[in-house]
């Protein structure tokens, strides 16, 4: 475990300044935004930007964090092992994001660890289907309910373990990410495993929050994006220079302009990139929270 950062005395109050940046950036981008950004510099989440944070919205691939939470809770309870395997059957392959759909043949034996990595790192939709063999939609929702999340839900398919990804809110997503970042959602081992995946940028999504950053800077962000129809979301954790969690951001948007453009030039995605740079440049103090990652090792290709 890496050392935690220590709060620097006399940290300036930057919340209003960042809120003003957020309002200006999102106004230019267009769309309808639902957002919560929290500063963890005091050891607890303090909102610095909040806009329509309780709006229930289709979470798209951000909901894979909910699936991860249920899965890793079962791992922590000893009911699932990361080394457990399942077969990549052709009829389980899903369209959309991911890598398994590009294979020319199937039948692979895949571990839970492999599926967790592909689900979070390349947002693989097939991985979600295969993980439903280990945690059903009803189990995911039961875990979320037990943890106090009332609006974050997947949609179970009748008579099946599979599910659609469902809905969430910016507030509940922010809370889930804070619990993950602070080590209160999962065990130490599971927290480290998940954050290793979410901070890795050699493969994965960098069009949004992490776009305008060096490799060292990108290693200080654990992110999960989602896109579906007119929705564009980017959520995650920003760590301080020592690897302690400093900020949690939950940017959700619907009614995005240029909705058929899923690339980096979509106006909302461009706004995400600008907001990511603004977060990094604005919040430079250290966090008193425990660190579960080492950004320097991540940036150099290690763990």
Q: Where is each model-derived feature located?
A:
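Structured C-terminal helix/loop/strand segments within mature extracytoplasmic catalytic/sensor domains
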Residues: 5, 10-25, 29, 134, ...
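Active-site SXXK
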Residues: 57-86, 249
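Short glycine/serine- and small hydrophobic-enriched flexible loop segments
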Residues: 69-77, 133, 175-182, 280-281
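Mid-domain, small-residue-enriched loop/turn segments at the edges of structured enzyme/sensor domains
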Residues: 32-33, 128-185
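Active-site-proximal beta-strand/loop segments in catalytic clefts of secreted hydrolases
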Residues: 38-41, 90-91, 119-123, 134, ...
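Short, conserved catalytic-motif segment at the N-terminal edge
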Residues: 30-57
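Conserved catalytic neighborhood of penicillin-recognizing serine enzymes
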Residues: 92-129, 137
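Acidic helix-start/capping segments at beta-turn-to-alpha-helix junctions
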Residues: 40, 82-100, 135-136, 197, ...
């Amino acid at each position: 475990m890496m050392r935690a950062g220590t709060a620097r005395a006399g940290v300036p109050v930057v919340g209003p300044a960042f809120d003003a940046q957020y309002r200006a950036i999102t106004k230019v981008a267009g769309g309808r935004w639902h957002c919560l950004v929290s500063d963890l510099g005091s050891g607890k989440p303090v909102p610095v930007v909040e806009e329509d944070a309780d709006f229930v919205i289709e979470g798209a691939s951000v909901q894979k964090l909910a699936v991860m939470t249920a899965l890793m809770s079962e791992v922590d309870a000893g009911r699932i092992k990361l080394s457990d395997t399942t077969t990549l059957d052709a009829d389980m392959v899903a369209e959309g994001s991911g890598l398994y759909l590009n294979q020319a043949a199937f039948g692979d034996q895949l571990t839970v660890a492999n599926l967790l990595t592909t689900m979070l790192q390349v947002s693989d939709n097939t991985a979600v289907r295969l993980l439903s063999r280990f945690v059903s939609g009803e189990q995911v929702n039961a875990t979320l309910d037990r943890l106090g999340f009332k609006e974050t839900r997947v949609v179970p398919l009748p008579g099946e373990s599979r599910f659609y990804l469902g809905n969430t809110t910016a507030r509940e997503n922010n809370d889930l990410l804070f619990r993950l970042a602070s080590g209160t959602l999962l065990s130490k081992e599971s927290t480290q495993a998940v954050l290793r995946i979410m901070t890795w940028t050699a493969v994965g999504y960098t069009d949004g929050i992490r776009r305008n950053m060096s490799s060292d800077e990108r290693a200080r962000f654990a992110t999960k994006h989602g896109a579906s129809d007119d929705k564009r979301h980017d959520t995650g954790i920003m760590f301080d220079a020592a690897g302690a969690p400093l900020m949690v951001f939950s940017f959700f948007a619907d009614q995005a302009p240029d909705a058929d453009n899923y690339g980096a030039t979509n106006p909302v995605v461009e706004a995400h990139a600008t907001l990511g740079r603004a977060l990094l440049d604005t919040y430079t103090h250290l966090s008193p929270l425990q660190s579960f990652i080492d950004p320097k090792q991540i940036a150099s290709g290690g763990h």
